[in-house]
């Protein structure tokens, strides 16, 4: 009888014993060449896009305010060099609903050297000017350059050369904002409660505040940006010191893991629980303190987010909410520890094995610096290109009508010939104002497409840099594992060799994997963009769909990242293309699914606690410093607008630094584990086919009952 063939397994066939296999394959060929060529062409196109944006863009358009003629205020070498402030002819038009759509007030705007200091209408100026000519000299500085005195208000409305009235204002981010002074709780300009705006209409303080808020909403982001820059300029030395402390702590923890993994594991746990407990205690103190004050709950309103942020930390609800959130995190960590208590010993042994590998390959701890440099280059290039693309083009002028009832509204116009057209006659009050920077050329028509290209290229390059690091580290740690006599059998310069192999042979495969991940992330960005566009509609079905898509893409991204990491390990080991490596890694994990659940969950959780502990220690020190509670340091920053800005920067920066160091550790543990699974399938522990795994790791897994001898 013929012998029946065994059907192929749905989980793939186990590895067979190969006496010649001694770690990462030396003889390789280039993989995924087509994807490599596409990737290189894509980078070339990205470079050309950057040069094109550099040639057409002008970042000054974001730094200087622009008048209605499209000229910069305060720019050196121009007639507006000494006119650094933007003045609005009719600030009440900034309350128009269409203003937020155009991001521009539908009123004439000119550059002036100073803001008005008194309330004065044009008619009052005419009357007073008969006795004192200085009134016209004062008023004309808020008019157009060619303005001349007119006799009637009708002539003034037709010419549009001067505002109907000027109000006491103060410069705010190079804009003249009405000076609203609080007198006995009532908002008043100067000392008037109601007044005429020069056109016969009576205005109230509420209208004034709405107009000021309208302008504030337009420039709010730039306001916060400047204040943030000021805070960074004040505290940058302390931020660098804090990041250095985070780097030293991360390095110290990695070294200590080699000798005291068990002790450090419990130190991570109790350290994180202690820091969160301190946060709960501090939030409770602030909550109790504010609760004893009268009027601790109030409605927040004012000029943009600056006022709201300042009030935010004076609300008892703020501290109560943060206390609840921290308490929930504390409880979740304790529950997770209870469920994972039986697997902690496995994680400790894996951490010790990872520490041994890193001690033999100390250059692995320096590799995050290279990753940081490459990521910084990618982020900087993306940001600069985005700014230059956003500021490309020439000034575009459009017809703006305050009433919004004109057939010519939003049509392009030329400010030089606009007064001689029929538009001012057909639409009284219409003006030809600067709207935005753009153009009608092919380049300007594709600005949005270029921005999308810029974002996708950024995501692709970021993921490629991370993939390159993972593949290089995997190759180095695989060389360590498959050395029978450590460190004698470890090849020289394993990290440098693995990095060279990855770049020379597997650029296409790494680009392929990073392309898949970048595509998923791009879809997430598109979903978020659509959600922001649909939020105002308050459509329940659309919101439900968004939540479902967001959840699906989040799960998909996590799954792709997990498969990519293991695929890069297989690429580093065998040098196959991305699809074959992904298939082999997936089958290997599926054949050993129980062992995967033992290691990954606990090990990653321990490393996460280490990152949180590093950022938490630096965060507590930063909080004490920036709130002047650290009495040891007397020269700390004391003039910060928002102390939480450098504080959050330090916490986030410390976490990213710790993530950079601990990601090396994570890749080390994952590579050792994949190699361990390969080792179990290739060998049997006999003298002729010995295991490469260390006895400590083998014994702990045997004790857990996860490995059964063949």
Curated annotation (Swiss-Prot):
Domain of life: Eukaryota
Membrane topology, Cytoplasmic segments: 1-32, 258-260, 341-345, 390-454, 531-604, 665-710
MF terms (GO), sorted A to Z: antiporter activity; choline transmembrane transporter activity
Bilayer topology term: Multi-pass membrane protein
Listed InterPro entries: Choline_transptr-like (IPR007603)
Keyword set, alphabetical order: Antiport, Cell membrane, Glycoprotein, Membrane, Transmembrane, Transmembrane helix, Transport
Protein name in the entry: Choline transporter-like protein 5
Organismal lineage: Eukaryota, Metazoa, Chordata, Craniata, Vertebrata
Gene assigned in the entry: Slc44a5
């Amino acid at each position: 009888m013929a012998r029946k063939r065994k059907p192929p397994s749905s989980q793939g066939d186990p590895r067979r014993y190969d006496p010649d296999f001694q770690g990462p394959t030396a003889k390789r060929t280039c993989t995924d060449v087509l994807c490599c060529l596409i990737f290189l062409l894509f980078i070339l196109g990205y470079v050309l896009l950057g040069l094109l944006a550099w040639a057409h863009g002008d970042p000054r358009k974001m730094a200087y305010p622009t008048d209605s003629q499209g000229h910069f205020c305060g720019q050196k070498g121009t007639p507006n060099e000494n006119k650094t402030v933007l003045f609005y002819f009719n600030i009440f038009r900034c309350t128009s609903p269409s203003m937020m759509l155009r991001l521009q007030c539908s009123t004439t705007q000119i550059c002036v050297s100073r803001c008005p200091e008194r309330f004065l209408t044009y008619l009052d100026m005419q009357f007073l000017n008969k006795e004192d000519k200085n009134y016209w000299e004062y008023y004309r500085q808020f008019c157009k350059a060619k303005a001349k005195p007119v006799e009637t208000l009708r002539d003034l409305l037709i010419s549009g050369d001067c505002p109907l009235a000027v109000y006491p204002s103060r410069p705010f981010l190079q804009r003249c904002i009405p000076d609203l002074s609080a007198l006995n709780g009532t908002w008043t300009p100067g000392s008037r409660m109601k007044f005429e705006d020069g056109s016969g209409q009576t205005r109230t303080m509420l209208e004034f505040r709405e107009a000021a808020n309208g302008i504030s909403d337009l420039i709010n982001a730039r306001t916060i940006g400047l204040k943030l820059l000021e805070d960074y300029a004040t505290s940058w030395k302390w931020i660098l010191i804090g990041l250095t402390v985070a780097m030293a702590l991360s390095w110290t923890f990695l070294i200590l893991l080699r000798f005291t993994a068990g002790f450090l594991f419990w130190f991570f746990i109790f350290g994180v629980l202690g820091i969160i407990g301190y946060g709960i205690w501090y939030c409770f103190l602030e909550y109790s303190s504010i609760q004893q004050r009268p009027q601790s709950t109030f409605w927040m309103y004012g000029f943009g987010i600056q006022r709201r942020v300042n009030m935010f930390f004076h609300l008892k609800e703020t501290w109560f909410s943060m206390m609840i959130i921290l308490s929930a995190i504390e409880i979740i960590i304790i529950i997770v520890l209870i469920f994972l208590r039986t697997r902690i010993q496995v994680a400790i042994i894996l951490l010790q094995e990872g520490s041994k590998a890193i001690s033999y390959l100390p250059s692995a701890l320096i590799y995050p610096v290279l990753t940081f440099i490459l990521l910084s280059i990618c982020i900087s290039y993306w940001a600069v290109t985005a700014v230059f693309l956003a500021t490309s083009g020439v000034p575009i002028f459009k017809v703006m009508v305050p009433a919004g009832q004109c057939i010519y509204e939003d049509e392009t116009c030329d400010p030089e010939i606009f007064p001689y057209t029929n538009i001012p006659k057909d639409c009284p009050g219409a003006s030809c104002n600067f709207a935005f920077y753009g153009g009608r050329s092919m380049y300007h028509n594709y600005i949005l497409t270029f921005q999308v290209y810029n974002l996708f290229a950024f995501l692709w390059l970021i993921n490629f840099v991370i993939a390159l690091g993972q593949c290089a580290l995997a190759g180095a740690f695989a060389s360590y594992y498959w050395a029978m006599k450590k460190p004698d059998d470890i090849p020289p310069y394993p990290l440098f060799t693995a990095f060279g192999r990855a770049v020379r042979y597997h650029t296409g495969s790494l680009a392929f994997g990073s392309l898949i991940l970048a595509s998923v992330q791009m879809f997430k960005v598109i979903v978020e963009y659509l959600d922001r566009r649909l939020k105002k509609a308050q459509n329940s079905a659309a919101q439900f769909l968004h939540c479902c898509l967001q959840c699906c893409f989040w799960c998909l991204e996590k799954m792709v990242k997990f498969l990519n990491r293991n695929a890069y390990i297989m690429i580093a080991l065998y040098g196959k293309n991305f699809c074959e490596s992904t298939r082999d890694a997936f089958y290997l994990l599926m054949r050993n699914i129980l062992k995967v659940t033992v290691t990954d969950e606990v090990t990653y959780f321990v490393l996460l606690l280490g990152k949180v502990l590093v950022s938490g220690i630096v965060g507590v020190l930063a909080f004490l410093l920036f709130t002047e509670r650290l009495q040891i340091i007397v020269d700390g920053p004391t003039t910060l607008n928002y102390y939480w800005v450098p504080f959050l920067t330090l916490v986030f920066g410390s976490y990213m630094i710790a993530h950079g160091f601990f990601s090396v550790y994570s890749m080390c543990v994952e590579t050792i584990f994949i190699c361990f699974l390969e080792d179990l399938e290739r060998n049997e522990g006999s003298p002729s086919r010995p295991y490469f795994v260390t006895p400590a790791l083998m014994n702990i897994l045997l004790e857990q009952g996860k490995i059964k001898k063949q």
